[in-house]
C-alpha cells in the first residue's frame, strides 16, 4: 500500500511541476520553452540547454499575454505559448529585480524576426526582445556575449548557415539560456 501511495505521489508531483496559474503571472515574468522550430536543435546544441525560445509576460487590455519574437513580435496567450513547447518542456522565472512600471511593448509589435541575431537592426529574436525590454527599464537582466562563445559555431552546417545569414563571430548576442541562468541564481 505504501509503495502504491508513493508512486501516486510521485506521479502527481511530476504532473504538477510546470503548473502555473495564469492569475499568479506578473508582468515581467520570463517564460522559457523547448521550441519545435527548425533552428531549435542548433540553439540547443550551441547553448547546451533545452531552453531554445523565450518570451516575456506583459499586461494587455485582454489580460496577461506572452510577448514573443517568432515570425514577428506578437502577443500570444500563455496557454498557446506553453502549448507549443516540445514534450511540454517549459518553465517560468521571475527575476529578482522586477520591472516596476508598465511595459511599453507596443513599439515592438510587428517587428520581423531577426535571422541575423544582431542588436539594433529593426528586427528581433526572442531573447533579444526580453533583454531589451529589461534594458528599457534600466535593468541588465544578463550580459551579452560574442557569437563565437556558442558551441554551435564550430559545427560545419551551422557555420555555413551563419555565413549565409551574415552572422559575425564577433557580434554580441543573448541566448534564452543566458537569461535563464542569470535569473535562476
Residue ranges and their predicted role:
Residues 27-28:
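Loop/turn positions that initiate beta-strands
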Residues 67-98, 102, 161-177:
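Conserved catalytic neighborhood of penicillin-recognizing serine enzymes
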Residues 39-40, 88-147:
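Active-site nucleophile-His-acid catalytic modules used for acyl/amide transfer and hydrolysis
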Residues 4-13:
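Sec-dependent N-terminal signal peptides
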